[in-house]
Swiss-Prot record:
Keywords: GTP-binding, Lipoprotein, Myristate, Nucleotide-binding, Palmitate. CDD domains: Rab1_Ypt1. Pfam families: Ras. Although this sequence lacks the C-terminal cysteine motifs subject to isoprenylation in other Rab proteins, it does have N-terminal myristoylation and S-palmitoylation sequence motifs. It comes from Dictyostelium discoideum. The keyword Nucleotide-binding applies. This is Ras-related protein Rab-1C. A motif (Effector region) lies at residues 62-70. The gene is Rab1C.
Length: 201
């Protein structure tokens, strides 16, 4: 399940992969273009995270992402314009063939679980198997526990989640798309880590 996408602003969603905006040599729109893939079970709030990051919006109206959607946002890191193409993948098994094709070329991956759902946390292992199969060996990862505003319904203790992430040497943090908690920080952290790992021209 996902949030209904906004129709306004530069963060509008599209399922058409030809809608990218590329800078030219004479009028560059950005210094670096990064592709980030957001994966995880259906209903963990992936679309809501993108909507919050791209448009600073949240809606309680839910629709399932069909296939793959994306949003674009340009940020500044160390004086450089970084354009982020953030891909929101469907969590349902029936879209697996479609979504796994988008792993190729991804610079970073955010694996999302719902802190109120132990099943979604346990699914991280399955998602990481797909990452190992389809993504570049150099892809950087971030595990995110979303919906931390629902702490009273928490099913996944952060200490347990952090121990799991530490064993895999993957950073982890918790977010709330509804309350806009650490959403920007999550995407910016991953983008910063990718930038640091990329050879500078």
């Amino acid at each position: 399940m996902g949030c209904s996408p906004s129709k306004e602003g530069n963060g509008s969603f599209s399922s058409t992969s030809t809608s990218f905006i590329h800078g030219s040599e004479s009028h560059p729109e950005y210094d670096m273009l990064l592709k980030i893939l957001v994966i995880g079970d259906s209903g963990v709030g992936k679309s809501c995270m993108l909507l919050r990051f791209a448009d600073n919006r949240f809606t309680d109206s839910y629709i399932s992402t069909i296939g793959v959607d994306f949003c674009i946002r340009t940020i500044e890191l160390d004086g450089k314009k970084i354009k982020l193409q953030i891909w929101d993948t469907a969590g349902q098994e029936r879209f697996k063939t479609i979504t796994t094709s988008y792993y190729r070329g991804a610079h970073g991956l955010i694996i999302v679980y719902d802190i109120t759902s132990m099943d979604s946390f346990n699914s991280i292992k399955r998602w990481l198997i797909d990452v190992d199969r389809f993504a570049s060996p150099s892809v950087l990862k971030l595990i995110v526990g979303n919906k931390c505003d629902l702490n009273s319904k928490r099913a996944v203790d952060f200490k347990i989640a952090k121990k799991f992430a530490d064993e895999l040497n993957i950073p982890i943090m918790e977010t709330s798309a509804k309350e806009s908690t650490a959403i920007d920080e999550a995407f910016i952290k991953l983008a910063s880590d990718i930038k640091k790992s990329t050879p500078q021209k």
